Amino acid sequence: MTLWLLPRLKLLFGIAAVMVVLQLINSLEGYSLNRFGLIPRELQALPGVLLAPWLHGSWLHLFGNLSGFMVLGALALLESRGEFIRASLFIIVASGVLVWLFGRPGIHVGSSGWLFGLWGLLLGRAWFRRSFADLLLAALALLLYGGFFYGLLPQQGVSFEYHLAGALCGGLYASWQRGGQKRRSRKRTRQG
């Protein structure tokens, strides 16, 4: 296996392992950990901005998110581990804040906002950078997960707010990433 790939896969499988262990504990505790999920406009629920993506309502919920997360996470990790971590932190925090501000009442849990954020990141990179590699990855993301567009629409029992906020934040991060690359490129040109 290529040396650069192994640490990236370890990161991805490590994240998945944490989610599975938390789900095991949560299911054994009657899903009592979900009280730490995100509850819109409740000050005491602000920690849910960071905790909600790690908690799930059922094993089916977890594995539904985890399968897509592993694929889209692997595609996003092709850029770099550091960029994946920065993008993930931005997506988790920014989408969580948006859901806290604008979400419907109730407890929001699950990694789908993060998942949609990675999807938005891949599509955004293709839109803003237009490199062959980014276009190829976005085409693959659309081919595999084109149905995500339906997840952006309101549905009963589904936090479409997290889906929408995640996708928007992933695209926004991609636009900032592009802007940073342009600034670095201009700086190198001036110093040349």
Which positions does each model-derived feature cover?
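A detector for small-residue-rich transmembrane helices and their helix-helix packing motifs
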Residues: M1-G192
